[in-house]
């Protein structure tokens, strides 16, 4: 807004704030100043005007109003106080007031008359001001009640040349009466009420229709914070080092609050506090109608005054008002303790608008200060006649609801946490079968092992096993027991150790006089780590369903097509199983693919024989639970010869009474039973892995037979069966290749199985396969 605006009042304006043209009328700035002192001045001319040029860097002048009458000493420049107050409430420090009908003296000042009547009016106004703003002296506050009125001239030098030029231009447009209004005697210093007001060099006649008080609420880059507008009963928060929850101000700056809510700063303060007002709803609201800008002087507002202020210093690094941070500058914290500035700088203060509560509103929340210099704790701030409420914020480290982490001594008294079962996460009852488990999982594992149950998962072998759902899927529960390392041999070993300890306890009691005799401790402890066989049990694929419709009449084509589709899904399951075998993925990727292409028929035929042996006593072929080839189906064309080879495997397993551990080791060895003639890319690693599982087969035999002379004989029989699988698989592959190449049979093959057969046909026709046999023919 331009500084040359008319001061001509409208008809609707309040007469108390209008400058009339008649001599002797009164100017009332009370409503405009909003809480400032009412200054009544008798005007000797028909119009009153004041203009001055002041830079943004001005010197603050301190004015002392004694409690008594006005003394005869040289009076300070009250016009600067009026100018500063007007700038404070209008949003800028350089307030421009001007009108076309205002008369300005030629000297650039308005002298105050020494008339007795005018002096009485001024004394009466000052007395009213002292009565309204006087408060009892704080015994711990050394600062006197004063008002910071004008900035320092060192920081804000005046430009008198601009002032004189402006006054010459204004002289021609103002009234003819150039007399000065005298309120003081000649021996008292005169001062200009509007001395600090700045006028631009433009014509004062511009924009005469606008109000001079509608100035742009913008701040010069060197100015202070924008003013805070207040209501008619506005008050400023009082900060004192002896009170709790006070606003944070600069060190050695101790603001006071009079009874009527006016702010009085100490004479040593160079800082103007932003105004905090209260609304009729009894809560504090900060109003900033202007633009908040960073100040170059890094002045900190609302910082607590305490002896240990040097911990923080006069400079702050960020600005945050009402929880809003600007991009660098000062930090302004309202109603928060100083510990949060140094310790919780990454957290913004939270201000909650809390209505008055009858029960909990006796005083403000106690803020616990911290610091190395015995920082004064923030105290209680009470205003007479006003409801006291909680500030709604405290540092996170000071909040009572935030509990500190328990110390080691407190945790020791509460006791150790309960031990959980490694299978279902229920409360463990002890170490069962070498693993910390509950009683339910202990009984389940014992029954599952001794009963030799062949559990099947209805899902994908990834069921959740916990306290509530542990009975839903016994297959996944049993798998999790094996993964945890449960083993029946651990219990037997534990009993042996316990028996040895009991036997040696009596001997040690008898020979307790001899310190050389000690309790015998076994040299070997039970193996609690899972073995390869237990891992093979865990990764064993589930039984797949063929989806065969038994209500439809059987045919060779339909059965063969269904078996091919089932075989394609079994090959996918075999690939996943092979990748889970310990050591197999260490081989080269090409070697892994080659071994799977050579052994896929071995794996499916041997698994078919195992299912037929366990479920049908080797009399039927159990391809799937919903597809069992009985003697009637074997009589179909092209079915009997192939079924005869498959029944051979089942019958041999039944004859030898192969255990589940032996079956798992033999199946793994069938995966490693055929290689190319040129060898594998990681042949040495392959030989090492194969030898490892041969030893595992020997361990499974020893586990079944014990330390007997028949172990080598059984090992011979089982390895002989493995060698015979090559002949069985060769016959099955020949028939499979024939049906794949003969399009007249119209037997469908899944995509993956067709790809494997296509890659395998040239290798078999060229004889590029080397059989790894245990025995020479």
From Swiss-Prot:
Alphabetized SMART domains for the sequence: HOLI (SM00430), ZnF_C4 (SM00399)
Matches recorded under CDD domains: NR_DBD_GR_PR, NR_LBD_GR
PTM description: Acetylation by CLOCK reduces its binding to glucocorticoid response elements and its transcriptional activity. Increased proteasome-mediated degradation in response to glucocorticoids.
Chain positions covered by the region annotation Hinge: 487-523
Keywords carried by this UniProt record: Acetylation, Chromatin regulator, Chromosome, Cytoplasm, Cytoskeleton, DNA-binding, Isopeptide bond, Lipid-binding, Metal-binding, Methylation, Mitochondrion, Nucleus, Phosphoprotein, Receptor, Steroid-binding, Transcription, Transcription regulation, Ubl conjugation, Zinc, Zinc-finger
Keyword presence, Cell cycle: no
Biased composition (Low complexity): 134-150, 394-414
N6-acetyllysine modified-residue sites: 480, 492, 494-495
Modified residues (Phosphoserine): 45, 113, 134, 141, 203, 211, 226, 267, 404
GO biological process: cellular response to glucocorticoid stimulus; cellular response to steroid hormone stimulus; chromatin organization; positive regulation of transcription by RNA polymerase II
Pfam families linked: GCR, Hormone_recep, zf-C4
Region (Modulating): 1-420
Stretch list, region Interaction with CLOCK: 485-777
Biased composition (Polar residues): 164-174
Region annotation Disordered: where it falls in the sequence: 1-23, 130-182, 394-415
UniProt cross-link Glycyl lysine isopeptide (Lys-Gly) (interchain with G-Cter in ubiquitin), position: 419
Protein function: Receptor for glucocorticoids (GC). Has a dual mode of action: as a transcription factor that binds to glucocorticoid response elements (GRE), both for nuclear and mitochondrial DNA, and as a modulator of other transcription factors. Affects inflammatory responses, cellular proliferation and differentiation in target tissues. Involved in chromatin remodeling. Plays a role in rapid mRNA degradation by binding to the 5' UTR of target mRNAs and interacting with PNRC2 in a ligand-dependent manner which recruits the RNA helicase UPF1 and the mRNA-decapping enzyme DCP1A, leading to RNA decay.
Oligomeric form and interacting partners: Heteromultimeric cytoplasmic complex with HSP90AA1, HSPA1A/HSPA1B, and FKBP5 or another immunophilin such as PPID, STIP1, or the immunophilin homolog PPP5C. Upon ligand binding FKBP5 dissociates from the complex and FKBP4 takes its place, thereby linking the complex to dynein and mediating transport to the nucleus, where the complex dissociates. Probably forms a complex composed of chaperones HSP90 and HSP70, co-chaperones CDC37, PPP5C, TSC1 and client protein TSC2, CDK4, AKT, RAF1 and NR3C1; this complex does not contain co-chaperones STIP1/HOP and PTGES3/p23. Directly interacts with UNC45A.
The name this protein goes by in its record: Glucocorticoid receptor
């Amino acid at each position: 807004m331009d500084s040359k605006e008319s001061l001509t009042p409208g008809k609707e304006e309040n007469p108390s704030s209008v400058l009339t043209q008649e001599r002797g009328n009164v100017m009332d700035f009370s409503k405009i100043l909003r809480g400032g002192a009412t200054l009544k001045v008798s005007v000797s001319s028909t119009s009153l005007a004041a203009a001055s040029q002041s830079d943004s860097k001005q010197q603050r002048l301190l004015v002392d109003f004694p409690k008594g009458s006005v003394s005869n000493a040289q009076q300070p420049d009250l016009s600067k106080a009026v100018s500063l107050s007007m700038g404070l409430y209008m949003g800028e420090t350089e307030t421009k007031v001007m009108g076309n009908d205002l008369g300005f003296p030629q000297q650039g000042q308005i002298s105050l008359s020494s008339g007795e009547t005018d002096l009485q009016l001024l004394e009466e106004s000052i007395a009213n001001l002292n009565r309204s703003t006087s408060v009892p002296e704080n015994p711990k506050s050394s600062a006197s009640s004063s008002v910071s009125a004008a900035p320092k001239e060192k920081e804000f030098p005046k430009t008198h040349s601009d002032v004189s030029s402006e006054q010459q231009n204004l002289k021609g447009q103002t009234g003819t009466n150039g007399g000065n209004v005298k309120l003081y005697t000649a021996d008292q210093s005169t001062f200009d009420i509007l001395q600090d007001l700045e006028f631009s060099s433009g014509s004062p006649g511009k924009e005469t229709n606008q109000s001079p008080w509608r100035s742009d609420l913008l701040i010069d880059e060197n100015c202070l914070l924008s003013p805070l507008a207040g209501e008619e009963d506005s008050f400023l928060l009082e900060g004192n080092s002896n009170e709790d929850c006070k606003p944070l101000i600069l060190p050695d700056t101790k603001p006071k609050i009079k009874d009527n809510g006016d702010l009085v700063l100490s004479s040593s303060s160079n800082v103007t506090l932003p105004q905090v007002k209260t609304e009729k709803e009894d809560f504090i609201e900060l109003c900033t109608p202007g633009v908040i800008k960073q100040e170059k002087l890094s002045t900190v507002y609302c910082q607590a005054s305490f002896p240990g202020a040097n911990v923080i210093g006069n400079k702050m690094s960020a600005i945050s008002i009402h929880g809003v941070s600007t991009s660098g500058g000062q930090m302004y914290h309202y109603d928060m303790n100083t510990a949060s500035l140094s310790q919780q700088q990454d957290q913004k203060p939270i201000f909650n608008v809390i209505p008055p509560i009858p029960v909990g509103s006796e005083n403000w929340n106690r803020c616990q200060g911290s610091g190395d210099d015995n920082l004064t704790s923030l105290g209680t701030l009470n205003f007479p006649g006003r409801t006291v409420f909680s500030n709604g914020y405290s540092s996170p480290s000071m909040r009572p609801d935030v509990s500190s982490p328990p110390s080691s001594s407190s945790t020791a008294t509460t006791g150790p946490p309960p031990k959980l079962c490694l299978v279902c996460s229920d409360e463990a009852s002890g170490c069962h079968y070498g693993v910390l488990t509950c009683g339910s999982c202990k009984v389940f594992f014992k029954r599952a092992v001794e009963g030799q149950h062949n559990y099947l998962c209805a899902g994908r072998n990834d069921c959740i096993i916990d306290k509530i759902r542990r009975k839903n899927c016994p297959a996944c529960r049993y798998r999790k027991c094996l993964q945890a390392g449960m083993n029946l041999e651990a219990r037997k070993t534990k009993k042996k150790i316990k028996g040895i300890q009991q036997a040696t306890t009596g001997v040690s009691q008898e020979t307790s006089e001899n310190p050389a005799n000690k309790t015998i401790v076994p040299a070997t402890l039970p193996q609690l780590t899972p073995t390869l066989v237990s891992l093979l049990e865990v990764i064993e694929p589930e039984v797949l369903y063929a989806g065969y419709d038994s209500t439809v009449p059987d045919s060779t084509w339909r059965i063969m097509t269904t078996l091919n589709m089932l075989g394609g899904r079994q090959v996918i399951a075999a690939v996943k199983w092979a990748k889970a075998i310990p050591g197999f993925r260490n081989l080269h990727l090409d070697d892994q693919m080659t071994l799977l292409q050579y052994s896929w028929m071995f794996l499916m035929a041997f698994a078919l024989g195992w299912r037929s042996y366990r479920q049908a006593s080797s009399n039927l072929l159990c391809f799937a639970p919903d597809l069992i080839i009985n003697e009637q189906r074997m009589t179909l064309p092209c079915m009997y010869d192939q079924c005869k080879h498959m029944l051979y495997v089942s019958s041999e397993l039944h004859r030898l009474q192969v255990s589940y551990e032996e079956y798992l080791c033999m199946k793994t060895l069938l995966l490693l039973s055929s290689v190319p003639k040129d060898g594998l890319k990681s042949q040495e690693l392959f030989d090492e892995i194969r030898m490892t599982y041969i030893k595992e087969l020997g361990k499974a035999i020893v586990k079944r037979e014990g330390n007997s002379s028949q172990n080598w004989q059984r090992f011979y029989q089982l390895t002989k069966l493995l060698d015979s699988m090559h002949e069985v698989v060769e016959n099955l592959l020949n028939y499979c290749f024939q049906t794949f190449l003969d399009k007249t049979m119209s037997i469908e093959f899944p995509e993956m199985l067709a790809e494997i057969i296509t890659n395998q046909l040239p290798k078999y026709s060229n004889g590029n396969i080397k059989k790894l046999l245990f025995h020479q023919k």
